[in-house]
A protein has these predicted regions:
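Membrane-embedded alpha-helical bundles of multi-pass transporters/translocases
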Residues: 2-523
Length: 523
């Protein structure tokens, strides 16, 4: 579930190292000796990522609109969401998560201290190791689905996701490679290409739905299988899309499986990755448990949660994820240069900006949950009916207050990763896991039918809030981070913006109801 300034300190513009392409987004190198990030560069990078991510998120919302039209909150849609969680888990763990969090700081440091050629050789070794490990895991996962089918009762709802899972598991390997390639491009300052990569998944997804579903009308099981194959093709497309840009940076995609662990930097990445994998694994276990418990409580619940999440992810991806994408390599370079003061300044400005942006978004979604859901998903002739709208709106109401929490957490976590401290987020995540599981189970047992998934969504928000507070306190103890001076004003401004947005949103909604009558309910 990112113009305002992000960093105000300006540094000197220097030439790229000899023999390397001059790139306005290139990272600092040993030859340049640059130690400070120019403020316009970080802001420009965030703007680029925000724009490209916005395009991808809008397409992601369009794809969910299409999914709602063809599948509604059916058990088949929920089963598809469950199957897609598995490759996404690997993506967040090995691609955008633990491996990237460990790889990008070491890759950035190698660029600074050893030069481009050495850094690219190191990257090839890491990608080769990833392909080898995930290739084996993917194969074993596919083989495991057949015994599971024989063990489950013939009428079990848990049989529905298995055929889709078999098809989509290799997507985990492809998307993890694509995520590492994106991390390299971000380190080179090529944010536009990496930010556009998810665009391909959404585009292929939408085209497949618009073509396959009408052709296979009345055959939803076949429709969903065709879509599963399309997602696998999208994973390959995301890898191929980034290769030309990396080739211009001197990278050659050639796997090498010999002596992978002989490189000290590879071993260092694995050492850094271990605690991060545990921490991110805990987070992903939370995500999986949310959907599994929701599916167990009500076959329609995972689909309702997904529709609500998609709306929340639109502003979260545009701003929160955009900031995190830019901040991780930025903090890594600043930490490698030993510039803690600039890290602090960058973080504080990012948090202030996110608070002012996200608070109004949370307020608007909170007060207009049902109208927003109805406007976006409830089209005549589709399978998304009033019950689907009600279930999804309840989930959105629970998720909306967490929008600010989710985005601020995305700003705090990269600081620890940039400092190559991956253990602290792990400890925090472990506390969150216990809390989230406890609240999830309590929600499923204690809440009435139709509200169980709301408790699950609320548990996610509360857990994220506690995790964010713990990260902030621990970061504060590390040094002069998160100074209180100046934040009181930012909090007041954020709350005023949220209140103004809530009043404006309700006023517009009431005006539309008065002008359009009952038709205003669809707004």
């Amino acid at each position: 579930m990112g113009g305002t300034s992000v960093c105000s300190s300006a540094g000197k513009q220097t030439l790229a190292p000899s023999g390397a392409p001059r790139d306005r987004g290139s990272p600092p190198t040993a030859q340049t000796g640059r130690t400070r990030e120019p403020a316009p560069r970080v802001l420009r990078s965030v703007s680029v990522v925000s724009l490209m991510t916005a395009v991808s998120r809008v397409l992601g919302l369009v794809r969910e609109i299409a999914m709602a039209y063809f599948f509604g909150t059916s058990a088949l849609k929920s089963a598809f969401d469950l199957a897609f969680i598995v490759p996404n888990l690997f993506r967040r763990l090995f691609g955008e998560g633990a491996l990237s969090s460990a790889f990008i700081p070491v890759f950035s440091e190698s660029l600074v201290k050893e030069g481009r050629e050495s850094a690219l050789r190191f990257a090839v070794r890491v990608i080769s190791l990833l392909v080898m490990v995930l290739g084996v895991v993917t194969l074993l996962g596919i083989l495991l689905t057949w015994p599971l089918e024989r063990l489950l009762p013939p009428d079990s709802r848990w049989l529905i996701p298995l055929p889709m899972l078999r098809i989509m598991l290799p997507y985990a390997l492809l998307i993890c490679v694509a995520a590492l390639l994106s991390g390299m491009l971000n380190t080179f300052g090529r944010f536009a290409i990496s930010s556009l990569t998810p665009f391909l998944l959404n585009l292929i997804w939408i085209v497949t739905l618009c073509v396959a579903c009408p052709l296979l009308r009345g055959l939803p099981e076949k429709q969903i299988i065709v879509l599963s194959w399309a997602i696998l093709a999208a994973g390959l497309a995301q890898v191929l899309f980034q290769l030309p840009a990396l080739a211009s940076e001197g990278f050659r995609f050639k796997l090498r499986f010999r002596a992978l662990l002989s490189d000290s930097k590879v071993r260092r990445v694995l050492a850094l990755m271990a605690p991060a994998a545990l921490g991110i694994g805990v987070i992903q276990i939370n995500v999986c448990l949310d959907k599994l418990l929701a599916f167990w409580a009500d076959p329609a619940a995972p689909a309702a949660l997904e529709y609500a999440e998609r709306i929340v992810y639109l502003p979260l991806g545009m701003f929160g994820t955009a900031f995190m994408t830019v901040l991780l390599p930025t903090f890594s370079r600043q930490a490698a240069a030993g510039d803690t003061a600039l890290m602090r300044e960058t973080l504080e400005r990012a948090i202030r900006n996110l608070a002012v942006i996200m608070a109004p978004c949370s307020a608007a979604l909170l007060v207009l949950a049902l109208p927003v859901i109805s406007l976006i998903y409830n089209f005549k002739g589709g399978r998304f009916d009033e019950t689907s709208a009600m279930l999804s709106a309840r989930a959105l109401t629970a998720y909306a207050p967490g929008l600010l929490v989710f985005s601020l957490q995305k700003a705090l976590t990269p600081v620890f990763y940039g400092l190559q401290d991956l253990k602290t987020p792990v400890r925090v995540s472990m506390v969150g896991l216990v809390l989230n599981v406890t609240m999830n189970v309590s929600s499923v047992i204690g809440l009435p039918h139709g509200w169980k998934h709301v408790g699950i969504a609320g548990s996610t928000v509360i857990t994220s809030l506690i995790n964010g507070i713990m990260l902030a306190v621990l970061l504060r103890r590390r040094g002069d981070f998160l100074r209180a001076a100046g934040f009181a004003g930012a909090v007041v401004r954020a709350m005023l913006c949220a209140a103004a947005m809530a009043v404006a949103a309700l006023s517009v909604y009431m005006l539309c109801q008065r002008l359009l009558g009952r038709g205003g309910d669809g707004l």
